[in-house]
Every structure is written in C-alpha cells, then in structure tokens.
Amino acid sequence: MSDRQAALDMALKQIEKQFGKGSIMKLGEQTETRISTVPSGSLALDAALGVGGYPRGRIIEVYGPESSGKTTVALHAIAEVQQQGGQAAFIDAEHALDPVYAQKLGVNIDELLLSQPDTGEQALEIAEALVRSGAVDIVVIDSVAALVPKAEIEGDMGDSHVGLQARLMSQALRKLSGAINKSKTIAIFINQIREKVGVMFGNPETTPGGRALKFYSSVRLEVRRAEQLKQGNDVMGNKTKIKVVKNKVAPPFRTAEVDIMYGEGISKEGEIIDLGTELDIVQKSGAWYSYQEERLGQGRENAKQFLKENKDILLMIQEQIREHYGLDTGGAAPAQEDEAQAQEELEF
C-alpha cells in the first residue's frame, strides 16, 4: 500500500470516527443509487418528471399565477403519501386551506399534520423540526410569499424591510437542505409570482423570497391555466399546463397537461384519455374514443364518464401507459424503512 493510500485511509477513519459511519464513502458504495420517488397523483406529471414522481429527500418548488392549481398539485402529493402509509404535514402560512376540498382529493384530514404559523420564522422552524424528526415523508409550505418575517409583522405598515424575506429563506434553506436529504423527506414550497418593475425585454415575472429557493430546488414546476373546461354554459374546471422548468433528476422542460375539475382536483380519466390517445393505446375516430374492441364514448367528456364508471378498463389503459413510460406500477415504500438509522444520521 502506498503512502498516499495509507494517508487517505487514515483520514477516512478519522472522519468516520468524528462524524459517524456513512459520513464519507465512495459514490459506488451508496446503498441506494436509484432515486426513490412518490407518485405526484397525476400520471402525466409523473411522466414529465421523468422518474415517476417527486424524488425523496429533495426540495420542490411549485409556482404560478393565482388560482392556477398549485395547492391542488401539492394536496394530490399528500394524498399519495398517505395512501402508502406515510406521514404528511401542511404548513398553511396563507391560512387558506380548505379541509373539505382536501378530503375530496383523497387527503386523510384526520391524519394530516397542520400548522398555521404567525411568522415566517415560526413556519420554517416548524418545518425544520418535522424534517429532523425523520418521521415525516412530505412537508408542504403554502406559500413562500406568505412567510412574513417577524420584524415586518411587528413593524408599522409603511416601514421598509428590504431583503428581509430573501435573507430568511436563504438562511432556512441552508439549514434545511442537508436534513431533508438525510431524512428522505419531500419538501414542497408553493410560491406565487410577481412582476419586476421596469423590465422592457424578456420575462418580467419573478418569484418572491429571493434566489435561494431557485438554487436549492431539485425540481421547479410552473403551473398555469390554459383554458376553461365547459359543459354547456357552465365552467366545470380548467385545463392546466404544468411545466418542469428545472429538474436535477431527469431532463427538464417537459410539460404535463391535466384537467383540474372544480371540487374534484386532477381528473385521472382526462389525462388517461389524452396520454392513451397520444400513445395510440386509445384510438380516436372522429369524435369517438375506443380501446381495443370497447367503445369509450362520443366526445372526450363522455369517454371520461365511461372510464369513471368502468375502473377495470381505466386500470388496464393506465398500466399500458405506465409500461410505456417505464414508471413503477407500484408505489415506493414509505421513507423511513430504517427510522433508527435515519435518526442517528440526523443527530450526528
């Protein structure tokens, strides 16, 4: 053994002794090289994300204009985690969560941890405590724009507080990012959009909270309404585009189109018809949709209703779509497979 190798081995032993086993290793020795994910609640979004859902142990930013469906997207993720037996938390800085709507999306509100903090510092400290516990699979913060620093709340209405929120987010994310990775918690930050003053060329839109969240996020999703979905003169929902503007775990810039129906959330039937037609799993002839020898209905809304009533056919089409995109047919196991080890790593 060379002197260099002996010196390296000694340094590695010293690091492990000081910081604990697993604090340094060769990349190929990592026990889990494949990215563990949780389904997003939308098949189209799972495909657009490229890995079959939201990656565990990462920060996700979901932003867009008002009433575009950002909270709906986050609530679907919570419902998926709960269905797999995981623990979810919702930090409602906007004080606007509708429990009835959440329940309709499949969220178990009896088990959902909810916090409605008074200040931005309080919200982020609660998020950090939940992440460091190693027992929470997903934490949603709604929204970054509503994380008001304590100094601003205690000050007068006309006081200037330049850069306070950006500094708060930067400090919080520096502390949170390592703990999120070790505990394999998914942290979803919902954000609004603002317009920069005096921008003549390029996109004037930006997100509040400074640049830190843009850097620390592994995935950034832009949610925008594309068009209204009508039945006669009644508006039933919106066709919504979700663009993956940043992705560190798969190629970015893919787009998912989903129907967000009022009072129902993302329409699984709608996206299965759209994806199925795109992949030629579902055949479209004129206005008629059919699958193999089975006619699904005339017009998209009738085909959606048919799939809603015939779950067996819906599942068969869904299975073929998942197979095409290479998505797991089953969900990922809850994050804490070895809670003791995760807790030990968090406390070193």
Swiss-Prot record:
Q: Where in the cell does this protein reside?
A: Cytoplasm
On whether Iron is a keyword of this UniProt record, the answer is no
GO CC entries: cytosol
Q: Which InterPro entries match?
A: AAA+_ATPase, DNA_recomb/repair_RecA, DNA_recomb/repair_RecA_CS, P-loop_NTPase, RecA-like_C, RecA-like_N, RecA_ATP-bd, RecA_C_sf
Keywords from the UniProt entry:
ATP-binding, Cytoplasm, DNA damage, DNA recombination, DNA repair, DNA-binding, Nucleotide-binding, SOS response
Q: Give GO MF terms, alphabetically.
A: ATP binding; ATP hydrolysis activity; ATP-dependent DNA damage sensor activity; damaged DNA binding; single-stranded DNA binding
Q: Which GO terms describe its biological process?
A: DNA recombination; DNA repair; SOS response
UniProt lists compositionally biased (Acidic residues) regions at: 336-348
Q: Where does ATP bind?
A: G64, P65, E66, S67, S68, G69, K70, T71
Note the superkingdom of the native organism.
Bacteria
Where are the stretches annotated Disordered? 328-348
CDD domains this protein is in? Answer: RecA
Its biological purpose is as follows: Can catalyze the hydrolysis of ATP in the presence of single-stranded DNA, the ATP-dependent uptake of single-stranded DNA by duplex DNA, and the ATP-dependent hybridization of homologous single-stranded DNAs. It interacts with LexA causing its activation and leading to its autocatalytic cleavage.
* Family (UniProt): Belongs to the RecA family.
- Name of the protein: Protein RecA
- List the source organism: Bacillus licheniformis (strain ATCC 14580 / DSM 13 / JCM 2505 / CCUG 7422 / NBRC 12200 / NCIMB 9375 / NCTC 10341 / NRRL NRS-1264 / Gibson 46)
